[in-house]
A protein has these predicted regions:
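Acidic/His-enriched low-complexity segments
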Residues: 2-418, 440, 445, 519-521, ...
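Hydrophobic alpha-helical and helix-loop surface patches within well-folded domains
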Residues: 240-242, 347, 379-559
Length: 559
């Protein structure tokens, strides 16, 4: 569309309409509108230089400027005009017919309009009469008019009884009995979990998390009952959820035990219950099984209520090859033989904790230990690296004592294990009582390691030990407040280092950290430290520099 200032100049012998408004041959449409507007197909257009007759020319004579018609019409966008030379005697497309009325719409126009109207009405009726549903990757999810929720489809085609990413609050876990048997030859594992749950609202379902697990059996037992009742289970992989359907209503205030048996493969990633390989002192390939559950990978090792607010106690049993060793959050209670060189390690019942803090390791490990206050501190590594754990042990003992005195709260567990893992993606993970590290952030060789290595190891240990109080003992309710965990641990990391190891000059590093936080926060990609998150992908994105660093500015003002 051309604006007034962009209108194309007409040839100099073409006459503007406003100059001849008195011409009687012209009908002013603004004053005498037609009853039926003409369609472009019904217009018989006479190619000429202007819509007005030129004075001095006969009715059937052609102005020389008509030769410019084609170019002028194209420039003015009049491609719809009829260019037939046989119709040039009609000098005005708007000239009224002899009977004084406008042309009627053609039959073709009436037919087209009728067809369009019929199609529009049909589409409206079709949409209105369709079953109420929402279209997703799984197809049409029908609406349950009783619950007024749109339920998705489970893998077996039945309606899954929960539609939200967050778990319902009608059932809460109290305790887990977890039995695992990893096989470092086949690189698979099998397991069973018994979850004691309490019912908050009457329900027929227990919805919890499961990811990549091959579930073979599910049963429910009432608190006073001794007979397991088979239960149907539905799976909805899109939300990593399963629903155990009770054979009868689950009553408010009652405890029930859900028993689930399953199997899976050890993960190829550094997430969940995963496997890694390394070369021993004889260059022989060995396998190592470890866990990394934060933020939402506990569900890939056992069915659970995998949200930080659902704290519970854990009794963990691990079956292993008698030549290997196992570690978990709590001290080992007993080891009993099973069969064919397989033994079972049972650990003491844990304190109430979130699922992302559960951890276990199965490998060939060696350690050195030291007692401090009421806790035994141990550092583990593969045998050929045992000579590099002394500095980590000494640093851990000093930091643990400092935090207990500073917080005036004793470390609540009887042991603290620090494990160097040959291949570990994160710098470290604060699992309660079993902190896992990358080898480069825990092992220190006095012959080859630098002062920079020593500062890094000290900082990482200080950070993870701070989490034993803030994050483990006290935990955020949901991942939008991850900054409470990581921001506090980051601040205490530098604070403790300056108090205990002033020769490392961590105050200079803290100043650099503050400037880094300001720089990150000035970018368009910055976000509030507390942001609404729902999906696993959104939760993962919360683990950025802002969650770790920005909040340290506020802590610095307070302290």
């Amino acid at each position: 569309v051309l604006s007034f200032s962009d209108q194309i100049q007409l040839p100099r012998n073409m006459i503007e309409n406003s100059m001849f408004e008195e011409e009687p041959d012209v009908v002013d449409l603004a004053k005498e509108p037609c009853l039926h507007p003409l369609e472009p197909d019904e217009v018989e257009y006479e190619p000429r230089s202007s819509r007005l007759l030129v004075r001095g020319l006969g009715e059937h004579e052609m102005d020389d400027d008509e030769e410019d018609y084609e170019s002028s019409a194209k420039l003015l966008g009049m491609s719809f005009m009829n260019r037939s030379s046989s119709l040039r005697n009609n000098m005005s497309v708007y000239r009224q017919s002899s009977n004084g009325s406008c042309s009627l719409p053609s039959t073709r126009t009436m037919v087209v309009c009728t067809v369009i109207l019929v199609i529009a009405v049909a589409l409206i009726m079709l949409i209105y009469l369709l079953p109420k549903c929402t279209f997703t990757k799984e197809g049409c999810h029908k609406k349950n008019h009783t619950m007024e929720l749109i339920y998705p489809l489970a893998t077996n085609g039945k309606l899954f009884p929960w539609a939200k990413i967050r778990l319902p609050s009608d059932v809460v876990p109290l305790h887990y009995d977890l039995v695992l048997q990893p096989n470092l030859t086949t690189l698979k594992f099998s397991g069973s979990v018994k979850i004691v749950v309490n019912i908050i609202q009457v329900t027929w379902k227990i919805v919890l998390h499961s990811s990549g697990l091959n579930i073979t059996k599910a049963t429910i037992t009432s608190a006073g009952g001794h007979q397991e009742k088979p239960a149907e289970f539905l799976e909805y992989p899109l939300h990593d959820q399963i629903a155990v359907m009770a054979p009868e209503a689950l009553l408010v205030g009652q405890n029930y035990t859900v028993n689930i048996e399953y199997s899976s493969n050890l993960s190829d990633t550094y997430y969940g219950f995963y496997k890694i390989s390394y070369k021993d002192e004889n260059s022989k390939q060995r396998w190592f099984a470890a866990t990394q559950f934060e933020p939402v990978a506990a569900r890939s090792a056992f069915p659970c209520f995998d949200e930080p607010a659902f704290k519970a106690t854990f009794l963990i049993k691990i079956k292993r090859d008698e030549k290997l060793s196992t570690l978990s959050n709590m001290p080992k209670k007993a080891t009993t033989p099973v069969a064919n060189g397989i033994v079972q390690d049972e650990f003491f019942v844990s304190l109430k904790m979130s699922t992302y803090l559960v951890a276990f390791v199965v490998a060939d490990l060696k350690n050195i230990s030291r007692q401090t206050n009421a806790s035994l501190v141990s550092v583990y590594a593969i045998p050929q690296h045992l000579n590099q754990v002394e500095y980590a042990l000494d640093t851990s003992v000093k930091l643990l004592e400092f935090y207990q005195n500073y917080f005036l709260i004793s470390y609540p567990l009887e042991k603290l294990d620090l494990v160097a893992i040959p291949d570990f993606q994160s710098g470290a993970m604060e699992n309660w009582g079993l902190i896992t590290f990358r080898e480069s952030t825990l092992l220190f060789d006095s012959n080859t390691s630098s002062a920079r290595d020593k500062k890094l190891i000290t900082a990482v240990i200080a950070h993870e030990l701070a989490h034993q109080w803030f994050g483990n003992l006290v935990t955020m309710e949901w991942w939008n407040d991850l900054w409470l965990n990581e921001g506090f641990a980051t601040f205490m990391e530098y604070f403790a280092m300056e108090e205990i190891f002033p020769e490392l000059h961590s105050d200079e590093d803290f100043l650099n950290l503050i400037f880094k936080a300001m720089m990150k926060d000035s970018l368009n990609s910055s976000h509030p430290v507390s942001s609404a998150v729902q999906s696993s992908e959104q939760i993962e994105e919360m683990f950025d520099a802002l969650s770790y660093i920005k909040v340290t500015l506020k802590y610095f003002e307070i302290f």
